[in-house]
Amino acid sequence: MKILRKLTKLEKIYIILFLGSLVAGVVNGTIDIDYFKCCEDAIGVPEEGTSVLKIFRSNFLLSLTELLTAGIFSLYYNFHTFSLTSSYLISQNALYTLPIILLIGSLELVGSLLMALTGFSFVERLLKIKSKLDYKILFFYGAALIFVGAVIEYLLLRSLG
């Protein structure tokens, strides 16, 4: 809780919007079960030769987009990803895996959020906002969480495949 006290109002608002987009995505995906059909290939259906490093590279590159846009992209990305995933799982009668998918997504998206907060260092200088965040540590933790999410995702794909 001490960490939350150190965040600026802008960062707190962003975190609330970030978590809201995740919840809205899951709700939208469970209501609209045909949502995934518009872009079936975009949800990471396992391919031949999937590995932890391929999953990590894909998720890490998306997270660099978060960094470059100071996290704004992640609000849409959360909604889109979780809508597709929830909708796909319902259509495959595999909704029981949703908690695992949420765990994986949460690790990866919190990692992305940490990397996005790293992008706030630029915004902070631009708007002359002062915070006590160590952006190098945030970047490291973000990358580590994305890697852990990739490992769990790989293990899930192997068990389902």
Predicted regions and their residues:
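N-terminal signal-anchor transmembrane alpha helix
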Residues: 3-35
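Helix-loop-helix hairpins and the membrane-proximal interhelical loops
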Residues: 12, 27-56
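Alpha-helical transmembrane segments of multipass membrane proteins
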Residues: 20-28, 62, 145, 149, ...
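Transmembrane alpha-helix/helix-exit interface in multi-pass inner-membrane proteins
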Residues: 26, 30-34, 67-92
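Interfacial helix-start motif at the membrane-water boundary
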Residues: 46-73
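Short alpha-helical packing/oligomerization segments
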Residues: 96-116
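Transmembrane alpha-helical segments of integral membrane proteins
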Residues: 113-129
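Terminal transmembrane helical module of multi-pass membrane proteins
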Residues: 124-161
